[in-house]
Amino acid sequence: MRWPCSSWFRGLWPEAAPWAVLLALGVPGWVLAVSATVAAVVPEQHVSSAGQAPLDWLLTDRGPFHRAQEYADFMERYRQGFTTRYRIYREFARWKVNNLALERRDFFSLPLPLAPEFVRNIRLLGRRPNLQQVTENLIKKYGTHFLLSATLGGEESLTIFVDKRKLSRKSETTGGIPVVGGTGNSSAVSLETLHQLAASYFIDRESTLRRLHHIQIATGAIKVTETRTGPLGCSNYDNLDSVSSVLVQSPENKVQLLGLQVLLPEHLRERFVAAALSYITCSSEGELVCRENDCWCKCSPTFPECNCPDADIQAMEDSLLQIQDSWATHNRQFEESEEFQTLLKRLPSDRFLNSTAISQYWTMDSNLQHRYQQLGASLKVLLKKMHRIVRRLFNLCKRCHRQPRFRLPKERSLSFWWNRIQSLLYCGESTFPGTFLEQSHSCTCPYDQSSCQGPIPCALGEGPACAHCASDNSTRCGSCNPGYVLAQGLCRPEVAESLENFLGLETDLQDLELKYLLQKRDSRIEVHSIFISNDMRLGSWFDPSWRKRMLLTLKSNKYKPGLVHVMLALSLQICLTKNSTLEPVMAIYVNPFGGSHSESWFMPVNEGNFPDWERTNVDAAAQCQNWTITLGNRWKTFFETVHVYLRSRIKSLDDSSNETIYYEPLEMTDPSKNLGYMKINTLQVFGYSLPFDPDAIRDLILQLDYPYTQGSQDSALLQLIELRDRVNQLSPPGKVRLDLFSCLLRHRLKLANNEVGRIQSSLRAFNSKLPNPVEYETGKLCS
């Protein structure tokens, strides 16, 4: 049903309103649809009993809903002690309002009934107004939109706040219906009475309010509030802004607005839209500019920071700070949780726990794992929210001179929590625990705490760690692992005692000193040995056509049982007859400690980095030369016997080459065709002898099976390993070291093969337990 209202609105509304809210233009006519409804009593229970927890958490500021007037009323009533709200209301007089002025223009081509003042302001703009003029003359006075259609209406309601704890229960004891008298001072009131009075509100308003006010004064258990909003009928409203709560917005009744530019002449429409967008978006502080899918405000000189919404940026930065506080709260709650504290109580205190040990206890605690997963889930939610705010913050600040200031929290790793447990265990002797440093076994205390470190138990483990802590003081070691010795409560690497009692190895000569002594052929470095040969004699000429074998031996077991010998150089003085074309060729074999010839090693003369023979003339007439090979400190080695195999070759010089070619001499039956003779005057070994005590080494070996005291077996093994390594260091050059130590045991200590093998196995087993063991492969030399 449509009918016009009896009054007309005057022109445009003069006051501006925000964006997307009604910015008024008066309408010359109304289309009204009247309806009224009455609602039932609606109770809202907020606190069920006196023992329930208070609702203070609900009364905090949480958004627009909590700032609504009705909620403010509820909050006030609740804080005064009321627990229940009864509300009866009815909506009345809803009118559907349509703008007939546009319909008359669109359908009947009638001119718009614009207000004279509005028309005058349009004319004052001229043909080409700037945006500031449009804003001052139109937008600030009339807004940016006008009303197409809306729904008007009102509401009246009665609200009763009730405190059930204060209601009288006399009616329950008497069993009668409570009667509320106008003069009684002790009337019994029940909830049923309040229901009946609320239901009669719209029937007899004045009588109902009078009785309710009497109950309110008499009992103090209720509080009555009456609310009436909206127009009471189709009255003469000149301006809708003067009516409170007029517009009714609901899904079926929406306010429809239209831009004010449709009422303006064609030449003003584009300028008006630009001015309206700048006014709304830039708050009259600049001009809106859009390029390449991006819009911003071109700020005026008066407002250089118009693109920078300080309030919004500050609010987002505050939100980030709140999230950081929540982040820290979650971590603190996890540390204070029952699961975390239970793990701390279960950890052993009689030994030190490193990060690896704590991680094992951490992994085995299923309850703690579940609690840690909850912490991770909560932090992920906060991190997602923080990233969303940060993106919005950067979008807002991309045209600001000041960049946003914030710090993203980082999720604490498992290693952090393991170190935190160590800090609580060992650095908690003050109000605030310090930070434990596992590498230095110390605590870093807070700046205001002089000391926070408590007793730190000894560390159990391999290597330098303790095997057991002391029973009387857990901070000190009680026993150590093999290869370490206990010293002042700590495990230090065990070092072998001096080997001077077994084998003296500290008489090395410097290279320059050795070279000088060899040049002088100093007798102090000559090792006197026995020359043996069945093929020749020293100082006698012989025919070198066939191989000659000679050797120098010491026979130490017979003559020098307390010495072992080191060879530094080998020298021969060889003489040749005049015009001889023979060239001596020698093969040298060295036997280190005795035994058969098969237990000797071949000297690789001039191979690789090994030295070659050096020849110096002694007697030019007899063509004598000293042939010397110098091993020096680099290639020195043990020797007991030196085998020399001498052969000769014919030396000739090829005219087409600078190389020397050797030929094996032919067998000459005619002495007249002999190519020459050879003589060896001396064969000497230069070096030095070392003191050697085989009995002391035998006693050391006996301690492997029969230790004198506790720890003597380990000490004996360490000394034997040191002796083995130092003897094998003088092994001859080669890809694999020769096992000279086994030769020493076999030939100088006269041990059986099985005994030597058992000793070597014991040394290898003990060496594998030592810290940083050095293993090397050795080749067998002695059988």
Swiss-Prot record:
Alphabetical list of InterPro entries matching this protein: BRINP (IPR033237), MACPF (IPR020864)
Subcellular location: Secreted
Signal peptide: 1-33
UniProt KW Secreted keyword: yes
Keyword entries, A-Z: Cell cycle, Glycoprotein, Growth arrest, Secreted, Signal
Record's GO cellular component terms: dendrite; extracellular region; neuronal cell body
Annotated tissue distribution: Weakly expressed in embryonic stem (ES) cells. Strongly expressed in ES-derived neural stem cells (NSCs).
Induction entry: Up-regulated upon differentiation into neuronal cells in the presence of retinoic acid and BDNF. Down-regulated upon differentiation into astroglial cells.
Domain MACPF: 85-281
Glycan-modified residues: 185, 354, 473, 579, 626, 658
GO term, biological process aspect, one: negative regulation of mitotic cell cycle
Annotated disulfide bonds: none
Main location: secreted
Role: Inhibits neuronal cell proliferation by negative regulation of the cell cycle transition.
Protein family per UniProt: Belongs to the BRINP family.
Protein name: BMP/retinoic acid-inducible neural-specific protein 2
Organism of provenance: Mus musculus (Mouse)
Upper taxonomic lineage: Eukaryota, Metazoa, Chordata, Craniata, Vertebrata
Gene encoding the protein: Brinp2
